[in-house]
């Protein structure tokens, strides 16, 4: 079994009889309206002959994993395989962008693709519709975690499916996030410190999970992207986007002793011989150690593409923007009463540009939409240009796709994450939100006992109230416990969540208990 790394999250897995591509992303228009580009450039793969493919896989709906141009160029005989999520958003997105119908694979069954035995897991909470794929032959196995977080119980079931430790695990070291990059409540120093803390939390998760997998090879995959639009070029230096070499060095310094690879497009790992054949051609012009000049040249090269994307959006006709905005959110209010109640906040949309306006959107048990007035109170604020609002209202651009472009500013008070606000904006779908509601209402009654740094004992819920991860692996600092999966932090004495709208049941035990 061989794995060719295609850049970003893309891989090509081949055996003597089977060849598949997963999450190939090669086009010169990047992703998220030209805000993300492949790093380093891998556009040469678009011209490759892929006629011998047995299948292509798209793990989830983010556009750095779903390349419509690549999928459209493929022969109709090559099936497009996707996980069967609670929502049909991924299916409909591929069908709309490519005029091809993907095949949904169930999560309950194993699937044979040529001589590759494949099984799919998804994140335990349906709030995050991302997937983990395992491929195995009689001799070798690969776990591709893509952008997903994997729980302790899932690691156990994956290793049971394989029958031991995997040969290769692919994990993301960088983030796909706009926090804290786009948030205005921080000065530059505070924002940098928040980013560093977030990077450390992510890499600690990678270290813990990679150690549990105990694979022969670990590949740091799926990012970071290059931000080539001049208006967001600054984000290339944000600590939340470490490159694979930075992540590799961090893990090695923390004592991870297995083989780690910081790959580039064209590198091929042969699991039979345990050798990595590097693409030396691409290394003539690019190095993970320093690519400052590379990014400047890359930005200049792609500028015409980015300008063209923006011009097309500018040309979108838009009348009655206020009515379209009102219709958009009043439909969203009817998607899920549960989400409205869990959000329970007022959002201010401050949109500049020729088709702009100012609006208040209240999500609660009695939601409402109105034009902004000077004395209106709000908890959250989004500011951006009206060209992007046209993409959302007229072309159904998902809010999450827009947020990932970093072309906005945000502010919130209190400064805590509201998972349900993002969930409703990104899904806007009854099936998806209902799956989350069922998951969150079916919480376990199991408890565990933990001890703080002072020796006090607390009985707490065994599973994190956010996404159901076991808190047995939680990190305890002073009177706080941090979930190792998504880094929600809880006060053991009160149960309050310090960084999100999500509380933990906690009870202090007597010393004799």
Language-model-detected regions and their locations in the chain:
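Catalytic core of the metallo-beta-lactamase
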Residues: 10-16, 110-166, 463
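Pre-active-site segment of Zn-dependent metallo-hydrolases
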Residues: 18-58, 68-73, 84, 150-164, ...
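Active-site neighborhood of phospho(di)ester-bond hydrolases with catalytic His/Asp-centered motifs
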Residues: 21-23, 52-64, 81-85, 143-149, ...
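Active-site HxH/HxHxD metal-binding segment of metal-dependent hydrolases
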Residues: 42-109, 477-509
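Metallo-beta-lactamase
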Residues: 82-140, 246-249, 261-262, 443-446, ...
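Cap/insert and terminal regions of metallo-dependent hydrolase folds
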Residues: 153-254
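Feature captures hydrophobic
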Residues: 269-463, 471-473, 481
């Amino acid at each position: 079994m061989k794995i060719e790394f295609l850049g970003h999250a893309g891989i090509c897995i081949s055996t003597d009889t089977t060849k598949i591509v997963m999450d190939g992303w090669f086009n010169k228009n990047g992703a998220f309206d030209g805000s993300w580009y492949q790093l380093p450039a891998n556009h040469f793969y678009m011209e490759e002959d892929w006629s011998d493919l047995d299948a292509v896989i798209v793990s989830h709906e983010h556009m750095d994993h779903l390349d419509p141009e690549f999928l459209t160029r493929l022969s109709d005989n090559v099936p497009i395989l996707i996980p069967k999520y609670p929502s049909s958003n991924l299916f409909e997105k591929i069908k709309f962008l490519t005029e091809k119908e993907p095949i949904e694979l169930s999560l309950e069954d194993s699937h044979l693709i040529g001589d590759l035995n494949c099984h799919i897991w998804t994140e335990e909470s349906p709030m995050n519709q991302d997937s983990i794929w395992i491929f195995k032959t009689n001799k070798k196995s690969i776990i591709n975690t893509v952008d997903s977080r994997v729980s302790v119980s899932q690691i156990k079931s994956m290793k049971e499916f394989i029958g031991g430790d995997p040969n290769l695990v692919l994990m993301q070291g960088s983030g796909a996030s706009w926090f804290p990059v786009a948030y205005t409540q921080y000065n530059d120093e505070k924002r940098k410190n928040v980013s560093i803390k977030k990077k450390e939390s992510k890499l600690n998760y990678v270290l813990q999970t990679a150690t549990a997998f105990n694979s022969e090879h670990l590949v740091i995959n799926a990012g970071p992207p290059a931000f080539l639009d001049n208006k967001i070029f600054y984000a290339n230096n944000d600590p939340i986007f470490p490159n694979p070499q930075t992540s590799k060095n961090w893990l090695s310094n923390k004592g991870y002793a297995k083989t780690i690879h910081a790959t580039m497009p064209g590198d091929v790992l042969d699991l039979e011989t345990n050798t990595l054949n590097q693409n030396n051609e691409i290394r003539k012009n690019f190095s993970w150690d320093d690519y400052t000049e590379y990014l400047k040249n890359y930005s200049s090269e792609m500028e015409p593409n980015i300008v063209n994307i923006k011009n097309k959006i500018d040309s979108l006709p838009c009348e009655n923007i206020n009515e379209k905005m009102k219709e958009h959110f009043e439909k969203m209010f009817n998607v899920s009463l549960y989400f409205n109640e869990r959000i329970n906040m007022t959002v201010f949309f401050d949109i500049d540009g020729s088709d702009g306006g100012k609006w208040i959107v209240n999500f609660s048990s009695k939601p409402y939409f109105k034009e902004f007035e000077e004395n209106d109170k709000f908890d959250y604020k989004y500011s951006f240009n009206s060209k992007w609002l046209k993409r959302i209202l007229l072309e159904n651009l998902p809010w999450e796709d827009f947020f990932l472009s970093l072309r906005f500013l945000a502010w919130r008070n209190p400064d805590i994450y509201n998972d349900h606000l993002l969930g409703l904006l990104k899904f806007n779908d009854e099936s998806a939100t209902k799956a989350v509601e069922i998951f969150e209402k079916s919480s376990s009654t199991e408890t565990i006992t933990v001890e703080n740094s002072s020796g006090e004992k607390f009985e707490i819920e065994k599973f994190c109230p956010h996404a159901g991860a076991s808190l047995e692996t939680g990190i305890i600092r002073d009177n706080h416990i941090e979930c190792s999966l998504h880094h929600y932090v809880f006060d053991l004495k009160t149960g309050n969540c310090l960084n999100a709208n999500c509380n933990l049941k906690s009870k202090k035990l007597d010393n004799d208990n």
